[in-house]
């Protein structure tokens, strides 16, 4: 891998993480490249959120290594890492009263006194449909509104005046969103990965959303990476029925050459 390619890649090798004698992540190796969306799927308890925490540096593996742009997380200065890697957790509550605009502006804190911070906040709020929420108390928003605000925050965190490699990690970002906002969020992420050197890695339970928007899919089961590849490679009826233990079928999307998953009654 060339130096320029290395600068745009996160590499995980043989990651293992255990607790109470049980491996939550077991010998997982993968790459996340700028310019793509990667979806992590799998049944409940598969280890999806644990893997995400290992890939972001919030957990240290018992074995294996994770290199962001060629460097282990321990070699990164916190301020530089915060401007390169952003994480949207599954639940992001606030104990105190902050306006939506204040929450989004928190994403700019690693950038110090950049003169256009306010402009960046307005831009990402517009992109995520949060402008009309700007003065609202974050604590009083619906779950879906809070998810949109948190997306704006992490986009603000990774915004740079010049194209700069970045990695965005999202844990179930569509779980509280209605259909319109699911589509809007994932279309926005797709657009950003095409326009910027940005890698997006997200945990998704909706397999059809993963098929529509992900460039690659990683299927986990009991901490192991049991399948990876394009949506067509991974979302096959036999594979999904085996690992999800569900009665299902897989067909084709009416408009695109991608699979769609259907549950049987």
Curated annotation (Swiss-Prot):
Any Pfam family: ABC_tran
Matches recorded under InterPro entries: AAA+_ATPase, ABC_transporter-like_ATP-bd, ABC_transporter-like_CS, P-loop_NTPase
Keywords annotated in UniProt: ATP-binding, Cell inner membrane, Cell membrane, Membrane, Nucleotide-binding, Translocase, Transport
Membrane topology according to the record: Peripheral membrane protein
Residues where ATP binds: 42-49
SUPFAM superfamilies the UniProt entry points to: P-loop containing nucleoside triphosphate hydrolases (SSF52540)
Principal subcellular localization: membrane
SMART domains xref list: AAA
Any GO CC annotation of this UniProt entry: plasma membrane
Class of enzymatic activity (EC top level): translocase
Domain called ABC transporter: residue spans: 10-247
TM segment ranges: none
MF GO annotations: ATP binding; ATP hydrolysis activity
Tagged with keyword Zinc: no
Family membership: Belongs to the ABC transporter superfamily. Heme (hemin) importer (TC 3.A.1.14.5) family.
Assembly behavior: The complex is composed of two ATP-binding proteins (HmuV), two transmembrane proteins (HmuU) and a solute-binding protein (HmuT).
Function of the molecule: Part of the ABC transporter complex HmuTUV involved in hemin import. Responsible for energy coupling to the transport system.
Descriptive protein name: Hemin import ATP-binding protein HmuV
Lineage of the species this protein comes from: Bacteria, Pseudomonadati, Pseudomonadota, Gammaproteobacteria, Enterobacterales
